[in-house]
Regions:
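Electrostatic, structured charged patches in enzyme active sites and in nucleic-acid/phosphate-binding
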Residues: 1-134
């Protein structure tokens, strides 16, 4: 089971229980919630890449509708919430990236189906683990 993490926006301290306030700052603060330590580490890495100029427009928990064709046109049957989206530098161009972080243990059949369906809609999904891209 993944360990949930709340990261203080002010000082960056990690909290493993839902905090009322930050233990380091001593004040009420806002927190970023992550479903796992690995996802929080990936977010920190993406922020470093932003500072280095390698990526831009980083966003978290972006929702993509999963569509199918019904008798009266397109129907949304589910949603995929991607962990991160960003633009990655590729020479002189910027390439949009949709990324989902998964534990090394693998992904659920439900998640695999949603990723395949989004890719069928023309959106490539980069699946990352602690060991790198899958």
């Amino acid at each position: 089971m993944a360990r949930k993490v709340w990261v203080c926006d002010r000082c960056g301290l990690w909290h493993y229980d839902k905090p009322d306030g930050c233990k380091a700052c001593g004040v009420l603060a806002t927190f970023q919630f992550f479903h796992s330590e690995g996802e929080a580490k990936r977010w920190a890495r993406l922020l470093m890449l932003v500072r280095a100029g390698e990526v831009r427009n980083v966003r978290r928990q972006v929702t993509f509708p999963l569509m199918t064709i019904g008798p009266k046109g397109p129907i949304e049957w589910a949603k995929l919430v991607a962990d991160f989206t960003y633009d990655e530098k590729d020479g002189d161009d910027w390439v949009p990236i949709v990324e989902d972080y998964k534990a090394v243990a693998g992904m659920s059949p439900d998640a695999a189906l949603k990723i395949r369906c989004l890719e069928a809609q023309g959106v490539r999904v980069r699946v990352m683990t602690a060991k790198g891209e899958v």
